[in-house]
Amino acid sequence: MDLPGPIHDILLVFLGSGLILGGLGVVLLTNPIYSAFSLGLVLVCISLFHIPSNSYFVAAAQLLIYVGAVNVLIVFAVMFMNGSEYSKDLYLWTVGDGVTSLVCTSILFSLITTISDTSWYGIIWTTRSNQIIEQDLTSNVQQIGIHLSTDFYLPFELISIILLVALIGAISMARQ
């Protein structure tokens, strides 16, 4: 998508603020339904990040898979839970909550310093000339299909086996 610079920057700031607010909502909201809806906002913002870089297929796939399936499944699972354990009592922090928040903030600050200290201009994207010609002649969906059936065949099959084992494990645990 060819947007002018200021509009592109405003769009990225809007999506980034949606990500931050949604992430804070997932962590800080005590009602699990509201937390699941905040997770849906985060997943929508992540999928919309792919549109300015002309990755429409990835954006649509993430919307369908994550927001359309995973988040709806989470909302249904939360709705079937017993709501009495989420009362409106005063919630006091425990030692585990303090240690967890300390670890998470230290990881956050280490990531921020690592990202700010990295020289991003030193990273060079190398492509061969025939790859550039191939990218011009085929669409994004065709490129994904070609790479999945040639270069990424083994990792794709391994991921499908892992997902199948996880699904069978979840079904067997649900029956018990």
Curated annotation (Swiss-Prot):
Catalytic activity: a plastoquinone + NADH + (n+1) H(+)(in) = a plastoquinol + NAD(+) + n H(+)(out); a plastoquinone + NADPH + (n+1) H(+)(in) = a plastoquinol + NADP(+) + n H(+)(out)
Recorded GO MF terms: NADH dehydrogenase (ubiquinone) activity; quinone binding
Enzyme class (EC, first level): translocase
GO cellular component: chloroplast thylakoid membrane
Chain ranges passing through the membrane: 10-30, 32-52, 61-81, 92-112, 152-172
Keywords, in A-Z order: Chloroplast, Membrane, NAD, NADP, Plastid, Plastoquinone, Quinone, Thylakoid, Translocase, Transmembrane, Transmembrane helix, Transport
Keyword Translocase assigned: yes
InterPro entries with a match to the protein in the record: NAD(P)H-Q_Oxidoreduct_6, NADH_UbQ/plastoQ_OxRdtase_su6, Nuo/plastoQ_OxRdtase_6_NuoJ
Enzyme Commission number(s) of this protein: 7.1.1.-
Pfam families hit by this protein: Oxidored_q3 (PF00499)
Membrane topology: Multi-pass membrane protein
Cell compartment(s), UniProt: Plastid, Chloroplast thylakoid membrane
Family: Belongs to the complex I subunit 6 family.
Subunit structure as annotated in this protein's UniProt entry: NDH is composed of at least 16 different subunits, 5 of which are encoded in the nucleus.
Role according to the record: NDH shuttles electrons from NAD(P)H:plastoquinone, via FMN and iron-sulfur (Fe-S) centers, to quinones in the photosynthetic chain and possibly in a chloroplast respiratory chain. The immediate electron acceptor for the enzyme in this species is believed to be plastoquinone. Couples the redox reaction to proton translocation, and thus conserves the redox energy in a proton gradient.
Protein name listed in UniProt: NAD(P)H-quinone oxidoreductase subunit 6, chloroplastic
